[in-house]
């Protein structure tokens, strides 16, 4: 158990008592005093505040301690989609839980800064990612109790315009995704769960036109729990996203590195609205991600 002295002086202190992960008392010192056993840890915050821990998403946190050093990273899976369209669908689907690297410098800094958990998927080059996991940034190994909060969170896919003639077109990528949802490959537990709506399908794309096509895909497969991860312009399809009940994950701030992001609302003073403001006004469920 832990007792936190929140505000006030020695004559008037408000206490917050926590036991087994729950708040058991928030009141004046003399009210909570009887609920605090002698062995409880007492911390005086000197006018500070207590906030719930943050959950990070979108970085390589937990999967790479030094991104530029291969020996300190889980690595990236190369895509075979460029040469053999269906070969990627037959390979094993990686799980982020199997690539977690605990105790690194980045994780320690994140944990000390209030990021207590993270949700990340395996890094990949190509269309197909893997299964993300929700883990504790302060854990030492996967053997620690509650080090992995949820082993299998969602299946991740990326849709992007081809960068050379050897990559499949965006239309081909969408056709393949539609085929996988309609007829999951035999033996693919992951795609069967996604097609039945048991797992979320997180699709990363920065193109507004692709987002519109994903809305049509959701109408075709209403049982699929689709989530869009995008740094592109979403304000023009905000109403459609809300009507289709499609949550989105967006970065708090975007520097427009790609042509696909050119239509974004910059925000004040250039525009009265921001992408986030328009999405929230239309009732879209929005999550904030890290942009690396």
Model-predicted segments: where are they?
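N-terminal helical capping/dimerization or prosegment-like subdomains
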Residues: 10, 14-26
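Short, solvent-exposed loop/turn and secondary-structure capping segments
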Residues: 28-29, 64-69, 129-132, 261
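Single conserved hydrophobic/aromatic residue that forms the stacking wall/gate
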Residues: 1-8, 12-13
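Short, basic, glycine/proline-bearing loop/turn elements
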Residues: 84-96, 218-222, 254-263
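Active-site-adjacent C-terminal substructures of enzyme catalytic domains
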Residues: 97, 107, 116, 120-132, ...
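Divalent metal-coordination and catalytic microenvironments
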Residues: 21, 47, 58, 110, ...
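Polyanionic/metal-chelating signatures
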Residues: 102-225
